[in-house]
Amino acid sequence: MFGFPNRAPLHYYDSVNTTQPIPESSIPRASVPTFQHAVDTYASEINKTASVWREFSDADLGWRPHPRSSTVEEILKHQLLSERRFFGQFLGSPEPAPAELLPKNGGVEAYIARLVELAGPRLPFLASQLQDWWLAVVPFFDVHRDRAWIFWRRILHTAHHRTQLTVYLRLLDRPVPSIYGPTADVKWKGADPTNTTEAAGRK
């Protein structure tokens, strides 16, 4: 099957971030080009998640904004555990045993390394799947959904918890990295945020 050798960068933030844990050159070609965007997006979202996690220090891991909120470390743990469940139970990818998921020393950099390490084998797994696999309906908790739906639900779930952590960063008075565009802390030449009616009306 053919690929997309001349495609644009995965995201305009990715193109200015030169320290991506998963470089674009390591992303495999999808067996079905229609689903290349899913493989690209998964790699890009892992990179974005790592960039948010990296803004925390080890001293922040026990911090929470409210007694009923999760701590920073609880959210990092949940990401690793729940992503393994989505991929292993619902999408059928080969995954490590649950007892092997969490890093041994528990520092922020160790969590980031584990996030990227676990994501790596999922990329060729996703890239190898044919259309029938993506469209097949399988059990998902107490309902049934097609695998493409489950995959995108996983992406949204990760984005939800990543957004929680960007709020934590702001409350801790830390810089908030760019995710899908410039922030109050990160800007670059050529960035064009949509904060005006003029920008919203561009064609």
Where does each model-flagged region fall?
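Short, positively charged and aromatic/hydrophobic N-terminal segments
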Residues: 11-12
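Short, contiguous alpha-helical
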Residues: 17-25, 39-43, 47-50, 60-101, ...
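Hydrophobic packing residues in well-ordered alpha-helices of helical domains and bundles
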Residues: 38, 42, 108-119, 151-154
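His/Met- and acidic-residue-enriched segments that coordinate or traffic transition-metal cofactors
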Residues: 53
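Helix-adjacent hinge/juxtasegments
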Residues: 88-129
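Acidic catalytic patch
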Residues: 126-141
